[in-house]
Curated annotation (Swiss-Prot):
Coiled coil: none annotated. PANTHER family: NON-HOMOLOGOUS END JOINING PROTEIN KU. Residues 216-229 are annotated as: Required for dimerization. With LigD forms a non-homologous end joining (NHEJ) DNA repair enzyme, which repairs dsDNA breaks with reduced fidelity. Stimulates rNTP addition to DSB and end joining (ligation) of linear DNA by LigD, on 3'-overhangs and probably also 5'-overhangs and blunt dsDNA breaks. Binds both ends of linear dsDNA protecting it from exonuclease activity. Keywords: DNA damage, DNA recombination, DNA repair, DNA-binding. Residues 260-293 are annotated as: Disordered. Residues 265-280 have a biased composition (Basic and acidic residues). Belongs to the prokaryotic Ku family. Residues 10-195 form the Ku domain. InterPro entries: Ku70/Ku80_beta-barrel_dom, Prok_Ku, SPOC-like_C_dom_sf. One of its GO terms (biological process) is positive regulation of ligase activity. It comes from Pseudomonas aeruginosa (strain ATCC 15692 / DSM 22644 / CIP 104116 / JCM 14847 / LMG 12228 / 1C / PRS 101 / PAO1). This is Non-homologous end joining protein Ku.
């Protein structure tokens, strides 16, 4: 079962449906790490002043919004936190609209909604109502301190929440400046019939298991082949790291010996012998000193 990333309730009117939210997608792309080819050590990112090229310490970094070209308004962390919406743990439905009314470019991220044991029947009621009316629910919800516009729609036996982009984030089709050859095209009836016939000949069903990411498949096949041939590059360890490892091994050995001596109910015999030898050497040394005197 997918891990819940949010728990709360769907609210519309006086109805509350306790639910949990889980991601409907996962990132499965190839993750290329940057490496120093001389030692295979990972290469990280530095905070750099883009003008001077010098690295900047964290305490000297502030957040600002460019208000005019080259001029910024600086905001403190406290001011930014105060602007975050208050989390109510509620998916608050405020309207129901036709499912075909929302343009696809507004869709953002999908999530699955799962009811808890108390909310199963009401959850099913909302899902079935949306299915029969052809409507989707519009709602407000706060996720990870960010306010989102979202829609709820049925998907087989479940309900899906899809976050929507705010209108200010969506570019208008007017910006494409499509000319009359597109907007007022005079299409030949015979050409339309031929195109329609081609579409019908190529008609199929949605079969997601048949669609493959060929780039990822080829890269992973190449990785497996190289690994099988022993073409693996390990990070080179510095000498001081090896020294620390040796210290750890010695300490482990000492701890084991200490535990054995405790289990034996007395001092470690090796320690007793070493102590006796040390005392003997001390007495012998003292006797030689007196004779020389």
């Amino acid at each position: 079962m997918a891990r819940a990333i949010w728990k709360g309730a769907i609210s519309f009117g006086l109805v509350h449906i306790p639910v949990s939210l889980s991601a409907a997608t996962s990132s499965q792309g190839i993750d290329f790490d940057w490496l120093d080819q001389r030692s295979m050590e990972p290469v990280g990112y530095k905070r750099v002043n883009k003008v001077t090229g010098k690295e900047i310490e964290r305490e000297n970094i502030v957040k600002g919004v460019e208000y005019e070209k080259g001029r910024y308004v600086v905001l403190s962390e406290e001011e930014i936190r105060a602007a975050h919406p208050k989390s109510t743990q509620t998916i608050e439905i405020f309207a129901f609209v036709d499912s075909q009314e929302i343009p696809l470019q507004h869709f953002d991220t999908p999530y699955y909604l799962v009811p808890d044991r108390r909310g199963g029947k009401v959850y099913a009621l909302l899902r079935e109502t949306l299915e029969r009316t052809g409507k989707v629910a519009l709602a407000n919800v706060v996720l990870h301190t960010r306010q989102h516009l979202a829609l709820l729609r049925p998907l087989q036996d479940a309900l899906v929440l899809i976050t929507l982009r705010w209108p200010s984030q969506v570019r208008s089709l007017d910006g494409l400046e499509l000319d009359e050859s597109v907007t007022e095209a005079k299409l030949d009836k015979r050409e339309l019939e031929m195109a329609k016939r081609l579409v019908e000949d190529m008609a199929s069903h949605w079969e997601p298991d048949e669609y493959k990411d060929s780039f990822s498949d080829k890269i992973m096949k190449l990785v497996e082949e190289k690994a099988a041939k022993g073409q693996l590059h390990a990070v080179e360890e510095e000498e001081e790291v090896a020294g620390k490892g040796a210290d750890i091994i010695d300490l482990t050995d000492l701890l084991k010996r200490s535990l054995r001596s405790r289990a034996g109910g007395g001092k470690d015999k090796g320690s007793e012998k070493a102590g006796a030898d040390a005392k003997g050497r001390a007495k012998s040394g003292a006797s030689r000193s007196r004779r020389k005197a």
